[in-house]
Amino acid sequence: MRVIRTNLNLSEDVIFNLSIRKGRDDVGNLTVYKHPEDEKGGQVHIEIAPKWRNRWVSRSLRDDLMDKLISVAKGFGLKVLYSTAFTDVSPRLLEFAGFSEYNVREPKTYYYLMIDGV
């Protein structure tokens, strides 16, 4: 898996976008939008392609993704806040990293993670 910073499909409310890829497959996107109530904050929205949704189980993958998200967010003067719940069962990446599901529909399910200003 690799995470690439892109500027594709950005609206004026978008701070930055990260593409998640496995080889040539597009696994999903992390998009950070401006926070409606915090000028220096943002909201992360994540989209995972259906075929990859049940594969987000490794801690190393979660750590790699969050490290890259935090690194890029810091470049924009943001601080990422997320919580983790350690368990004996291999949790899915999104739940493990504190993402919340907010819109379930085919072919995508949307999740969010709050980002606060520094």
Where are these regions (language model features)?
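A conserved beta-strand-loop-helix scaffold within acyl/acetyltransferase catalytic domains
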Residues: S11-F16, V27-G41, N103
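C-terminal "cap" of GNAT-fold acetyltransferases
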Residues: P107-V118
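Short amphipathic alpha-helix that is part of the acyltransferase structural core
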Residues: M1-I15
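Conserved acetyl-CoA-binding loop-helix of GNAT-fold acetyltransferases
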Residues: R55-S71, F96
